[in-house]
């Protein structure tokens, strides 16, 4: 029997606020356990939550970016369940009236195919604390530093049908929240976590199967593997005439399996009710319009713009959109030397990216300012310096020098354009390599690059390669 896989995703994006959702405690990662915990986070009696306005603004930004509906009235509710790292005995979340509903995100599937992923809702909630099982051998520790950190939970409809589509959507969403500046997207630190809801059904059937939830996946590779395993597990169960149990499961990357964690709860199990300590959020249209007018450049619009740039291919575009900092750096350079598109991207994703990787740097704090890099790339594009000399100058710029003209003057890097002098060099090379000349004339045209290389070597990279190319073709016939 053939089967269809149906997937819905819930993403928890940690918002980049300096303080928590309902307290003034810091959200900085990696602090000493329980050093960033307020009375509210610890669930002590007699304290009241105070809503972080910045989290509301970030949620609205996201809602606008996914073309969603920003609800003018939004309500916080208590989600009741017991867990050791949830000291209040409930989580403040949103259920009946979330802040964002009915949005969508377009994803690129290759071969110029596009798919629209429907986002049912995005709501605010506080994160729970963390259980530390490995810190002690005879008991589990509780760290409440994360408790109360603002999360935006982003929930799709069950409209994804393969691991490839799911991961593609997650990468697109990950890119969006980083470009919006609302989430750093650091999956290793848990800033961007995903729950996968998966079921399978007979091919063509309109009736969904029993779903399982894969909890807290924080790696695109693990998500892909977990989905593949769970698909196969469901299929094996059903083809043996058994029933899939609705439950929450954990993915174990060590042996590439999933294992049961607990029975999957339904909404009624959480006994949601409006939090009496928090007023409903009233969002007016003027506030939404102001936020909309201040949205940054978004990846989908940037992609379409870059796609219309003839000199850029998909690999170039993906590199430019790999991070907001990369895009902003590229954008600044492009504005200063607009004609040098291909030169810019070749250097950024080639020599420059290699240097950054080697020195564990990013475009967030580039060693060369955009202004200096633009001046440098302009000289390459205008053929004022050769590629070999450009590499030497680039190393000096990375070391902190900024005045390119001063470097060229000091090092004697001025390009040699004297036609008669270059012609003399070409004649010498042709006399020096008679066998290669015979081979070239016999049809081995690739040897032209050899002759150009010899000319560049003799001039220490100062010769104009285009002039050398023309002179060689003239003399070689």
UniProtKB/Swiss-Prot annotation:
Coiled-coil region: none
EC number: 6.3.5.-
Gene Ontology molecular function terms on file: asparaginyl-tRNA synthase (glutamine-hydrolyzing) activity; ATP binding; glutaminyl-tRNA synthase (glutamine-hydrolyzing) activity
Reactions the enzyme catalyzes: L-glutamyl-tRNA(Gln) + L-glutamine + ATP + H2O = L-glutaminyl-tRNA(Gln) + L-glutamate + ADP + phosphate + H(+); L-aspartyl-tRNA(Asn) + L-glutamine + ATP + H2O = L-asparaginyl-tRNA(Asn) + L-glutamate + ADP + phosphate + 2 H(+)
Sorted UniProt keywords: ATP-binding, Ligase, Nucleotide-binding, Protein biosynthesis
Role noted for this protein: Allows the formation of correctly charged Asn-tRNA(Asn) or Gln-tRNA(Gln) through the transamidation of misacylated Asp-tRNA(Asn) or Glu-tRNA(Gln) in organisms which lack either or both of asparaginyl-tRNA or glutaminyl-tRNA synthetases. The reaction takes place in the presence of glutamine and ATP through an activated phospho-Asp-tRNA(Asn) or phospho-Glu-tRNA(Gln).
Subunit-structure text: Heterotrimer of A, B and C subunits.
Protein name in UniProt: Aspartyl/glutamyl-tRNA(Asn/Gln) amidotransferase subunit B
Organism of derivation: Legionella pneumophila (strain Paris)
Gene responsible for this protein: gatB
């Amino acid at each position: 029997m053939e089967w269809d896989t149906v997937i819905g995703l819930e993403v928890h994006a940690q918002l980049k606020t300096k303080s928590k959702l309902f307290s003034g405690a810091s959200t900085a990662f990696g602090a000493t356990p329980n050093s960033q915990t307020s009375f509210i986070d610890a669930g002590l009696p007699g304290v009241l939550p105070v809503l972080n306005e910045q989290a509301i603004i970030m949620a609205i930004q996201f809602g606008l970016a996914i073309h969603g509906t920003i609800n003018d009235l939004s309500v916080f509710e208590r989600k009741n369940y017991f867990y050791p790292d949830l000291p209040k005995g409930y989580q403040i979340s949103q259920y009946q009236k979330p802040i964002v509903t009915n949005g969508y995100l377009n994803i690129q599937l290759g071969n110029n195919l596009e798919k629209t992923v429907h986002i049912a809702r995005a709501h605010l909630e506080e994160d729970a604390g963390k259980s530390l099982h490995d810190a002690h051998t005879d008991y589990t520790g509780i760290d409440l530093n994360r408790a109360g950190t603002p999360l935006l939970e982003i929930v799709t409809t069950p409209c994804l049908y393969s691991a490839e589509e799911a991961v593609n959507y997650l990468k697109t969403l990950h890119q969006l929240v980083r470009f919006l500046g609302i989430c750093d997207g650091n999956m290793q630190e848990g800033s961007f976590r995903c729950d996968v809801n998966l079921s399978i059904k007979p091919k063509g059937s309109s009736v969904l199967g029993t779903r399982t939830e894969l909890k807290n996946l924080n790696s695109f590779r693990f998500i892909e593997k977990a989905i593949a395993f769970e698909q196969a597990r469901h299929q094996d169960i059903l083809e043996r005439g058994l029933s899939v149990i609705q439950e929450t499961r954990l993915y174990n990357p060590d042996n590439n399996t999933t294992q049961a964690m607990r029975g999957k709860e339904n909404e009624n199990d959480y006994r949601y009710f409006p939090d009496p300590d928090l007023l409903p959020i009233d969002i007016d249209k003027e506030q939404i319009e102001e936020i909309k007018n201040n949205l940054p450049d978004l990846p989908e619009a940037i992609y379409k713009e870059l796609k219309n740039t003839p000199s850029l291919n998909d690999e170039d575009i993906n590199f430019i959109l790999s991070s907001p900092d990369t895009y902003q750096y590229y954008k600044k350079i492009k504005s200063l030397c607009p004609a040098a598109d291909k030169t810019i991207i070749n250097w950024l994703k080639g020599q420059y990216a290699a240097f950054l990787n080697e020195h564990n740097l990013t475009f967030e704090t580039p060693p060369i300012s955009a202004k200096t890099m633009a001046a440098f790339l302009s000289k390459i594009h205008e053929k004022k310096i050769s590629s070999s000399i450009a590499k030497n100058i680039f190393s000096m710029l990375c070391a902190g020098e900024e005045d390119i003209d001063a470097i060229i003057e000091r090092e004697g890097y001025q390009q040699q354009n004297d036609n008669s002098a270059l012609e003399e060099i070409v004649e010498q090379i042709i006399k020096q390599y008679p066998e290669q000349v015979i081979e070239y004339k016999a049809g081995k045209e690739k040897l032209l690059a050899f002759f150009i290389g010899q000319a560049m070597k003799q001039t220490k990279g100062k010769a104009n390669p285009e002039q050398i190319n023309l002179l060689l073709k003239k003399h070689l016939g």
